[in-house]
């Protein structure tokens, strides 16, 4: 009968095995520790035995000679073994370094072989193309030399790659050869070199001209803000200026370059004198060379003004349109004589009847230019420079006028209404024909800087004329004039213009809008191509009386070259209130004022010979020199 093993006995057996294993492990650890201790003790005893053997050797103990030799022999053997191991390790390290260097050299050789194959392939291909030319022209001249140089470079490159002797100088030689080949490849044919030089010379000359144009002149303090604008010109702007200048006749350019030495000496003497008032400061001689550029443009503008005066004015105004047909021939004569224009005097101009012909004043300009002192050699750049300065100085002038009027209103009480009759002056001072040009040319009484002074006279006179036309339109009581024209009431209009200029707020200076548009229309870079004014709308209001406010008037001025349609007049205040006869009379007066505006603009474009400047009679003015224009206009018309 079989008896089954008890599970408890098996568990006990397993526990016994585990305990035995643990005991054995502990014993093994103890034996290892004992072995380490014994080893340490052996090393210590060996060291002590070695030291004792050395000491005994010193004392020459014959008894312990064998023991001493054995001890020392064992020590020497151990030291030799250690030295051998160290030597082997050093040799192994050297061998490893040598292996690495050889492996690096092998990789470099493989790279050289690959480059040599590529170079030989390119050389073979190049020689095939060289020996079998398709085009006979390519086998001669510069192309053949370039191909031979390329083949020489490839052959040398292959030789240097495959020759191990020149490994050290390989990099330097390759760099030198590559530079030489690049120079050969980049060197164009002689014809191409000449073409490139011809193309580069005009650009360089244009750059030098542009820089010299901005730096060679001797500007005054008033012209300093414009210097930065001229330096920033580009080549295409200078080209445009040259193209515009090339359209002028050659004779005009020759006349503009003729400067008598008298004016130059006068200019040098006047530079050393004390500063003068801004209204009468001297201009440089270079200003005179810009007159010719505008003469052709003036003739066409005068023609447009003549068309307006002929087609849309009554017969009596045709007779009194300031002699456009008679003055055109005088303008051509002035065109040939305007090359040397006298500068403005330092004081008010004294006009003598015997010295100045009556008809010669028709060619006078009443507005000096604002250009800086440029030498005559840079006359072609005038049209480009003027457009930039015109825009900047116009904006600055508007702000200056507003500030001056605000200061006058703050400092002085409201000026009383001026008398409707202007003070009389001696008729011997000014000829009768000169009244046609200067009776609507008052200058601003405010103190403006030298930089803005040339604009003040032009723009203030333009405001006066526009204000006169506004008063003509806005005055229903004067519509039915006994004489049919407004010449009899010129003194009344004159006083109303003065009052309106003295009492208008800065916000009502609407003619400045027209002023900026006219400046941009006449003086912009492409102004010579426009040949006329663009449609300019001028809206303004005038207070003819302190108690009565006239309605807002809008006047549309559309003068242009070859204009065949009559100018449009939009009058919101007269719609349905005025009769047909009164509307025609008002329209005739407005057209006549339009003719005067165009003629005054024509007078102001070139440089002036004389300028008759007089001031408004204000609360602080000591005297007013204003010609009795009403009486003289009546005498001329009557």
UniProtKB/Swiss-Prot annotation:
Residues 214-226 have a biased composition (Low complexity). InterPro entries: NBPF (IPR055306), Olduvai_dom (IPR010630). The keyword Calcium does not apply. Gene3D superfamilies: 1.20.5.1700. Keywords: Coiled coil, Cytoplasm, Repeat. Residues 157-285, 563-584 are annotated as: Disordered. Residues 174-261, 326-399, 400-503 form the Olduvai domain. Residues 10-43, 69-115 form a coiled coil. Residues 165-179 have a biased composition (Acidic residues). Residues 192-202, 232-251, 264-273 have a biased composition (Basic and acidic residues). The keyword Acyltransferase does not apply. Belongs to the NBPF family. Encoded by one of the numerous copies of NBPF genes clustered in the p36, p12 and q21 region of the chromosome 1. This is NBPF family member NBPF6. The gene is NBPF6.
């Amino acid at each position: 009968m079989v008896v089954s093993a008890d599970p408890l006995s098996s568990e006990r057996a397993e526990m016994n095995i585990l305990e035995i294993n643990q005991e054995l492990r502990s014993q093994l650890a103890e034996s290892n520790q004992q072995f380490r201790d014994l080893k340490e003790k052996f090393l210590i005893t060996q060291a002590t035995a070695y030291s004792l053997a050395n000491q005994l050797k010193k004392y020459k103990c014959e008894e312990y000679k064998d023991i001493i030799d054995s001890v020392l022999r064992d020590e020497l053997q151990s030291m030799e073994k250690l030295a051998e191991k160290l030597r082997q390790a050093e040799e192994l390290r050297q061998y490893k370094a040598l292996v690495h260097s050889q492996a690096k050299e092998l990789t470099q050789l493989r790279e050289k072989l690959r480059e040599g194959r590529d170079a030989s392939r390119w050389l073979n291909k190049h020689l095939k193309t060289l020996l079998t030319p398709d085009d006979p022209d390519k086998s001669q001249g510069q192309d053949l030399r370039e191909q031979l140089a390329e083949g020489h470079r490839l052959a040398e490159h292959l030789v240097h790659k495959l020759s191990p002797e020149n490994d050290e100088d390989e990099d330097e030689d390759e760099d030198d050869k590559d530079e030489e080949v690049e120079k050969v490849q980049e060197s164009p044919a002689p014809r191409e070199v000449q073409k490139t030089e011809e193309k580069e010379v005009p650009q360089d000359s244009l750059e030098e001209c542009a820089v010299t144009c901005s730096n060679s002149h001797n500007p005054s303090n008033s012209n300093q803000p414009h210097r930065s604008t001229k330096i920033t010109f580009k080549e295409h702007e200078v080209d445009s200026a040259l193209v515009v200048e090339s359209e002028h006749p050659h004779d005009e350019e020759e006349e503009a370059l003729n400067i008598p030495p008298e004016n130059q000496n006068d200019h040098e003497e006047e530079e050393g004198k004390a500063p003068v008032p801004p209204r009468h400061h001297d201009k440089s001689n270079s200003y005179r060379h810009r007159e010719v550029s505008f003469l052709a443009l003036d003739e066409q503008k005068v023609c447009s003004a003549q068309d307006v005066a002929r087609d849309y004015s009554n017969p009596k105004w045709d007779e009194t349109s300031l002699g456009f047909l008679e003055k055109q021939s005088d303008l051509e004569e002035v065109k040939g004589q305007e090359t040397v224009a006298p500068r403005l005097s330092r004081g008010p101009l004294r006009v003598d009847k015997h010295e100045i012909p009556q008809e010669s004043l028709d060619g006078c300009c009443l507005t000096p230019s604002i250009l800086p002192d440029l030498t005559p050699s840079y006359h072609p750049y005038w049209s480009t420079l003027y457009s930039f300065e015109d825009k900047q100085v116009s904006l600055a002038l508007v702000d200056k006028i507003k500030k001056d009027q605000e200061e006058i209103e703050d400092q002085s009480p409201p000026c009383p209404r001026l008398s409707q009759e202007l003070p009389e002056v001696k008729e011997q001072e000014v000829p009768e024909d000169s009244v046609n040009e200067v009776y609507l040319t008052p200058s601003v009484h405010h103190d403006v800087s030298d930089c803005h002074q040339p604009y003040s006279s032009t723009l203030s006179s333009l405001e006066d004329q526009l204000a006169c036309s506004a008063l003509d339109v806005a005055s229903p009581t004067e519509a039915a004039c006994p004489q049919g024209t407004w010449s009899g009431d010129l003194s009344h209009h004159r006083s109303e213009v003065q009052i309106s200029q003295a009492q208008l707020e800065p916000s009502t200076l609407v003619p400045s809008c027209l002023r900026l548009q006219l400046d941009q229309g006449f003086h912009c870079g492409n102004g010579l191509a426009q040949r006329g004014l663009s449609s300019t709308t001028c809206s303004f209001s005038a207070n003819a009386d302190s108690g009565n406010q006239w309605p807002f008037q809008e006047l549309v001025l559309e003068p242009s070259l070859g204009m065949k349609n009559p100018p449009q007049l939009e009058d919101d205040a007269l719609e349905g209130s005025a009769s047909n006869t009164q509307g025609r009379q008002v329209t005739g007066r407005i057209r006549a004022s339009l003719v005067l505006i165009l003629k005054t603009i024509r007078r102001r474009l070139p440089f002036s010979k004389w300028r008759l400047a007089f001031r408004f009679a204000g609360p602080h003015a000591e005297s007013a020199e204003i010609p009795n224009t009403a009486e003289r206009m009546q005498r001329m018309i009557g």
